[in-house]
Design a protein with these regions (language model features):
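Bacterial signal peptide processing site
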Residues: 14-16
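A short glycine-rich beta-turn/N-cap micro-motif
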Residues: 31-34, 55-59, 80-85, 104-110, ...
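Acidic, glycine-anchored loop motifs typical of Ca2+
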Residues: 43-46, 67-71, 92-95, 117-120, ...
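C-terminal motif of bacterial Sec signal peptides marking the signal peptidase cleavage site
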Residues: 10-12
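Post-signal peptide N-terminal segment of mature Sec-exported envelope proteins
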Residues: 19-43, 50-51, 60
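Calcium-binding motifs, dominated by EF-hand helix-loop-helix domains
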Residues: 37-41, 51, 59-65, 75, ...
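Bacterial N-terminal signal peptides that target proteins for export
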Residues: 1-2
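Aromatic-rich beta-strand edge motifs centered on tyrosine
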Residues: 25-29, 50-55, 74-79, 99-104, ...
Length: 178
């Protein structure tokens, strides 16, 4: 092997691997376990995926899809590494205000929404076979459901309200044609 060839190999080995630079790992100082992976998925020098880890297991993944510095999507995982729920920021303020839950088969089953953007869920949307079937909502913030919606064929069929605060509907509007 010539000196020139050896020099080229040594210099080449000292160059950073651009693919490796896209993924950064952090380890817990006490346990030595992997605690975070940061990924530059778009290859533009800015991290856009943050994976919070317990060793080799995902706890949560946060994604800044539009790279504005605010997280847009949160994925939460069970200890068995199943996707538990997906959070999104509907107001694009970097705070989750809606969470989607799926069945074991991956079909959307429920969405919980904090309509006041305060982190407190007050609207529950239930899905059957991929379509909205019913909604329950706490409209006055007292922690009790006081509005119920039923949906049929992707259209609202009826809305019921608890205007007397008894915990049961006392007024219903039916939108179905009779």
């Amino acid at each position: 092997m010539s000196v020139v060839t050896l020099a080229i190999l040594v210099v080449g080995c000292n160059q950073p691997n651009p693919e490796a630079a896209r993924v950064q790992a952090k380890y817990d100082e006490k346990t030595g376990k992997l605690s975070q992976l940061t990924v530059d998925a778009k290859k533009d020098g800015k991290p856009d995926i943050y994976s919070y880890m317990d060793g080799t297991k995902f706890i949560r993944i946060e994604i800044d899809k539009d790279e504005d510095g605010k997280i847009d999507r949160w994925e939460y995982y069970t200890p068995a590494q199943k996707l538990e729920k997906v959070g999104v920021s509907r107001s694009n303020d970097g705070k989750p205000d809606a969470w989607a839950y799926s069945t074991a088969e991956g079909v959307l089953s429920r969405i919980e929404v904090a309509t006041h953007h305060d982190g407190k869920v007050n609207r529950f949307e239930y899905y059957e076979k991929g379509s909205l079937a019913r909604v329950e909502e706490d409209t006055d913030g007292d922690g009790k459901i006081d509005k119920w919606e039923t949906w049929e064929n992707n259209a609202i069929a009826s809305v019921s309200f608890d205007l007397k605060h008894t915990g049961k509907p006392d007024t219903t509007i039916d939108y179905r044609k009779k």
